């Protein structure tokens, strides 16, 4: 995953400049290489498992690299892994736990001393006794001490709940915990612990804690501490292991085939080993005619040109076109490689193995990642390629099968928001593949009641169903590498039980409700203008997650009559409000959310002005800069974010309105849209004036339905 992330980062930052022309070159070269390999003619002189017509000797002395490698691998594998036991690791972990308990004692003692002094001082001055030091202050003090004097990692690896429990523990219980946990860590670390048995040691330690004298309330905390403290103390020494294995491998004498050595005698059966040696000595090579090489080159160039011209016609940004071509070519090349494997299996005389080819793999993936048109295009590409590569009597039948199977997968795959629906489509494609094979066998007047027919049907089903299984497994890899956001991933993110959504609900319920309302408004607008409504809805769910860091400072989370901004300067309030977009983007990045969701959190306010605090600051400082009170942006880069930009402001403004009549709602919406236009907030995305008009009308209709005036019925008096 780290490699995929590095690739994606390079692709986002630099790849857009260089990858577009390089894409076609790589696509053409690799495809050309595979096609040439698949169509390379077989030798007619020597065949596997057949009798050699004459004695063949080695024309030269060469190293049998495969045999040498095999022997060296055996020698290397025979060397056992080297592990180094470090006793100091155990001592250090015990000392770490002891330090933790010591600092908890120290923090409590300091707090007690401070509270005593404060009480005495207040008593002398005839003032009310001040509140004792809070647990939060003690927790901060403890974490500062641990970070400074022990390790910064300890505060990030042990939860605040554990620290708080230790701070608040009674002296007697605390001492019991300290004794038992320290003893358990010391006892556990006396064992030789590797990564393989680390979990079992931790489980045993936690079981000991469960049976210990520690009060039940503190057992989970104690278990957490021993789990953190117990680490491997016998570490795999990669350097020594590699050195010993390298030494063992190098000690192996290279296996050689000597000049004049008999490879196969006349009349002898050519087995796999003999055949391999003949290939290694290039005694089976039979070059293709130059015209054939040229023909394949023209074929690949034609495919690349079709893909290029078709993609060029699409109304997409250049970077998006590049990504589309890269995805298409990658999937095509994977299919080509699968075709290569099937052709190899054919050389092993496995009857009807061609029907095992997963023709549905490429169209299934491309329909989910791109669209239906690219899926059908891949079917044509693969079918035409198979026409060139399957060089036997059944070539046309296999090509027709691939064409039908691929097209069927595109038609059958309708609901791909759920994995179960995808797998059901794959099962249906497998069954339909069996029908296609039966039809082809009937057309060829083949005998149906034989084992090879049953095998062909089985291969056809496995090829269809297996293609979908492979596709489901590969799609997350494409999502990671290219930063894609598929429908299934969006549905997953829309689940109310997602940890981040639960976090918003628990920490900022007002923001959660606001986000749901904005999602309903924005989704309706996206549907009307043909934008990605699911992306808009899910993006709204997470767009204000940055507010969870300081919920009370945002109006929707404030209790009636309590506004913490009353105690702050405009500058302080500005910093808190403006930071929620960046904070949200950071939270989403830390949780490995897709880039489009991160972009929504970062861009949903664009570079708009925080007017209230700007004018408030201007009252005391006329020279205040407007730029200092604008969001850092960037401005919305897509029409989906532009929709959220408008809907977010409209929802907040209408909700704060005392009388949201239809006239008032219309006035608010028109004012916000006009303000955004005059401020140039939509200059960097592809949204049109006509689309904004549709958004306006949709917002008016939707909000009027929510806030419409109800008929007031008179009270029913007896």
From Swiss-Prot:
InterPro entries: HD/PDEase_dom (IPR003607), HD_domain (IPR006674), HDIG_dom (IPR006675), Metal-dep_PHydrolase_7TM_extra (IPR011624), Metal-dep_PHydrolase_7TM_intra (IPR011621), PgpH_phosphodiesterase (IPR052722). It comes from the Bacteria. This is Cyclic-di-AMP phosphodiesterase PgpH. Substrate binds at residues 514, 544-547, 555-556, 631, 648. Mn(2+) 2 binds at residues 544, 580, 604-605. GO terms for cellular component: plasma membrane. It comes from Listeria monocytogenes serotype 1/2a (strain 10403S). Able to bind Fe(2+), but has only very weak PDE activity. The gene is pgpH. The chain crosses the membrane at residues 18-38, 290-310, 325-345, 350-370, 371-391, 393-413, 422-442, 458-478. Changing residue 543 to A: Decreased Mn(2+) binding, decreased c-di-AMP binding, no c-di-AMP hydrolysis. Residues 1-17, 311-324, 414-421, 479-718 are cytoplasmic.
């Amino acid at each position: 995953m780290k490699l995929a992330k590095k690739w994606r980062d390079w692709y986002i930052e630099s790849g857009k400049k260089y990858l577009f022309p390089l894409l076609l070159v790589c696509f053409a070269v690799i495809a050309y290489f595979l096609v040439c390999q698949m169509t390379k003619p077989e030798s007619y002189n020597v065949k596997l498992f057949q009798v050699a017509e004459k004695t063949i000797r080695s024309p030269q002395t060469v190293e049998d690299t495969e045999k040498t490698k095999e022997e060296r691998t055996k020698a290397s594998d025979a060397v056992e892994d080297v592990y180094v036991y470090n006793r100091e690791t155990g001592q250090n972990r015990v000392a770490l736990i002891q330090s933790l308990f010591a600092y908890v004692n120290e923090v409590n003692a300091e707090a007690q001393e401070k509270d005593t002094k404060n009480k005495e001082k207040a008593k002398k001055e005839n003032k009310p006794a001040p509140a004792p030091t809070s647990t939060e202050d003690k927790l901060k003090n403890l974490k500062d001490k641990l970070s400074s004097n022990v390790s910064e990692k300890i505060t990030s690896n042990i939860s605040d709940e554990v620290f708080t429990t230790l701070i608040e523990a009674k002296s007697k219980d605390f001492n019991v915990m300290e004794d038992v946990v320290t003893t358990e860590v010391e006892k556990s670390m006396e064992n030789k612990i590797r990564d393989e048995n680390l979990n079992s040691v931790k489980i045993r330690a936690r079981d000991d804690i469960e049976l210990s004298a520690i009060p039940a309330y503190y057992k989970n905390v104690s278990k957490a501490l021993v789990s953190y403290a117990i680490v491997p103390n016998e570490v795999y020494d990669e350097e020594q292991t590699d050195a010993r294995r390298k030494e063992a491998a190098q000690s192996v004498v290279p296996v050689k085939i000597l000049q004049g050595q008999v490879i196969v005698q006349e009349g002898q059966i050519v087995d796999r080993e003999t055949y391999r040696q003949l290939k290694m000595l290039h005694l089976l090579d039979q070059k293709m005619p130059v015209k054939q090489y040229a023909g394949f080159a023209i074929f690949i160039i034609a495919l690349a040109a079709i893909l290029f011209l078709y993609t060029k016609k699409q109304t997409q940004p250049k970077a998006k076109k590049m990504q589309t071509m890269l995805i298409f070519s990658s999937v095509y090349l994977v299919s080509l490689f699968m075709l290569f494997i099937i052709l190899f299996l054919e050389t092993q005389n496995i009857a009807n193995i061609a029907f095992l080819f997963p023709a549905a793999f490429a169209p299934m993936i491309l329909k989910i990642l791109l669209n239906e048109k690219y899926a059908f295009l891949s079917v044509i590409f693969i079918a035409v390629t198979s026409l060139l590569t399957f060089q036997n009597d059944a070539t046309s039948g296999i090509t027709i099968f691939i064409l039908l199977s691929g097209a069927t997968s595109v038609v059958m795959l309708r609901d791909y928001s759920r994995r179960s629906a995808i797998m059901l489509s794959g099962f249906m494609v497998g069954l339909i593949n069996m029908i296609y094979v039966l039809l082809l066998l009937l057309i060829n007047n083949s005998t149906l009641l034989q084992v090879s027919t049953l095998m062909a049907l089985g291969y056809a089903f496995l090829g269809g169903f297996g293609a979908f299984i492979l596709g489901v497994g590969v799609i997350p890899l494409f999502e990671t590498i290219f930063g894609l956001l598929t429908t299934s991933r969006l549905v997953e993110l829309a689940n109310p039980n997602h940890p981040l959504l639960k976090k918003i609900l628990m920490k900022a319920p007002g923001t959660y409700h606001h986000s749901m309302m904005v999602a309903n408004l924005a989704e309706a607008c996206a549907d009307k203008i043909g934008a990605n409504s699911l992306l808009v809805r899910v993006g709204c769910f997470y767009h204000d997650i940055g507010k969870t860091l300081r919920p009370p400072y945002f109006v929707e989370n404030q209790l009636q009559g309590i506004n913490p901004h009353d105690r702050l300067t405009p500058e302080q309030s500005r910093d808190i409000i403006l930071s929620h977009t960046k904070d949200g983007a950071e939270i989403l990045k830390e949780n490995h959310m897709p880039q489009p969701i991160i972009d929504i959190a970062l861009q949903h306010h664009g570079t708009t002005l925080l007017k209230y605090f700007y004018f408030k600051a201007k009252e005391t400082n006329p020279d205040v800069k407007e730029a200092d009170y604008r969001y850092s942006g960037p401005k919305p880069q897509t029409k989906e974010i532009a929709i959220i930009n408008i809907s977010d402001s409209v929802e907040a403004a209408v909700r704060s309105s005392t009388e949201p009549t239809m006239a008032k709602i219309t006035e608010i919406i028109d004012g916000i849209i006009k303000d955004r236009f005059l401020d140039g907030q939509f200059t960097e995305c592809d949204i049109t004036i006509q689309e904004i008009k549709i958004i306006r009308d949709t917002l008016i209709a939707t909000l009027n339905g929510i806030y419409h005036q109800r008929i007031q019925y008179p009270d029913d008096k007896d």
